[in-house]
Curated annotation (Swiss-Prot):
UniProt key word Ribosomal protein: yes
InterPro entries: Ribosomal_bL35, Ribosomal_bL35-like, Ribosomal_bL35_CS, Ribosomal_bL35_sf
GO molecular function: structural constituent of ribosome
Descriptive protein name: Large ribosomal subunit protein bL35
Pfam families: Ribosomal_L35p
Tree of life domain: Bacteria
Protein keywords: Ribonucleoprotein, Ribosomal protein
Organism this protein belongs to: Shewanella loihica (strain ATCC BAA-1088 / PV-4)
GO cellular component: cytosolic large ribosomal subunit
Length: 64
């Protein structure tokens, strides 16, 4: 049986942890001048993928 392929885009964006998959938050790439310092600071923190999305991520990362 052939090896399962890892989705490389998903591999770069998500990291497997004991509690699920860790991801970076959106809205921190551009148009930052109108966002407050507090909002930008909070967006820097990593967060976990939603429970409903975990099976899809796990399927794309078979060796994670």
């Amino acid at each position: 049986m052939p090896k399962m392929k890892t989705d490389k885009g998903v591999q770069k964006r998500f990291k497997k942890t004991a509690n699920g998959f860790k991801r970076k938050q959106a809205h921190l790439r551009h148009i930052l001048t109108k966002k407050s310092t507090k909002r930008k600071r909070h967006l820097r923190a990593k967060c976990l993928v939603a429970k409903s999305d975990v099976p899809a991520i796990a399927r794309q990362l078979p060796y994670a």
